[in-house]
Amino acid sequence: MPYNCCLPAMSCRTSCSSRPCVPPSCHGCTLPGACNIPANVGNCNWFCEGSFNGNERETMQFLNDRLASYMEKVRQLERENAELECKIQERNQQQDPLVCPAYQAYFRTIEELQQKILCGKSENGRLVVQIDNAKLAADDFRTKYESELSLRQLVESDLNGLRRILDELTLCKSDLEAQVESLRQELLCLKQNHEEEVNTLRCQLGDRLNVEVDAAPTVDLNRVLNETRCQYEALVETNRREVEEWFTTQTEELNKQVVSSSEQLQSCQAEIIELRRTVNALEIELQAQHSMRNSLENTLAESEARYSSQLSQVQCLITNVESQLGEIRADLERQNQEYQVLLDVKARLECEINTYRGLLESEDCKLPCNPCATTNACDKPIGPCVTNPCVTRSRCGPCNSFGC
């Protein structure tokens, strides 16, 4: 009778489903007693010659015990798995359904706080703008005050210069008045001298007349005196007019010089005021450009800092992703190695199963039909979830051979 016992399908997934995290060093001995397998077990060439060596029964007994322990372990793991599933279901039924807490109130509070923060930021920005405007206005007023102060100093210096010119003109006027007074005194002196000379001449002429009366009178002294007087008066009047004309011309020239100097001074002052206004406007514009440059530099620095922080964050994210990729690749390599080890274990187990099946078939073919052999439940197929009834076999017959 051929051996029809159904063996359980052994694969790396079945043998390792209960231990997914077993280190690779333990994958070579997945079943108890696997490290004590004889050297000839697992070699597919030893039974192909059609003869058995002296350790045939020991090898079959060893494989039978190993298969029994494996099936016992599978049944134990299935029972533990069922118990764990029952416990998980009971735990899920006992636990209350997870209710998500209501965070709407907190969300509203957070939104209100965010609105307040935004309002505060806008208010701070407005205050900063007002402070900047006030600083600019203060700077403008300071520059205007400095310009007006410089203009005042210039006007005061001009007034001091005009006062000096006025003092000089006053001195010139006093000198001219002194000259006029001296000329008048000289005129009076000349008149007095003239009168004295006239009187002396009259006295002399009178004496001579008395002397000459006795002689014969020749000239009219009164007429001569009148002519001389007229000549002197004309000379004095001419000198007076010349002096007055010279004084008038000098005064007019000085007045013209003063007027022209005052006009030039006013034009220079107006030009200076216009230039100072232009300078003030240019200074204000320069300060505005400086403030704009400072604000643009601050904005540029803030933008650079923000983009550098964002770049560092992106770089950190890239580094994290690269590290995660490295870990995933290492994990994939490790899982690939584990998979290869499991494939090797599967191949070795399949080879052992084939060896075991070949031994059983060859033994069944060599042994004569045993009338004591009892048929077991192996006649009907066994599914993958049914335990194998052929694990334990009884010895019977005079040859003490294994039955079905």
Swiss-Prot record:
From which domain of life does this come? Eukaryota
Annotated stretches, region: Coil 2: 220-363
Q: Where is this region: Tail?
A: 364-404
Which region ranges are annotated with the description Coil 1A? 57-91
**Note in the entry:** There are two types of hair/microfibrillar keratin, I (acidic) and II (neutral to basic).
Family, per entry: Belongs to the intermediate filament family.
**Name the UniProt record assigns to this protein:** Keratin, type I cuticular Ha3-II
**Source species:** Mus musculus (Mouse)
Q: What is the lineage of its organism?
A: Eukaryota, Metazoa, Chordata, Craniata, Vertebrata
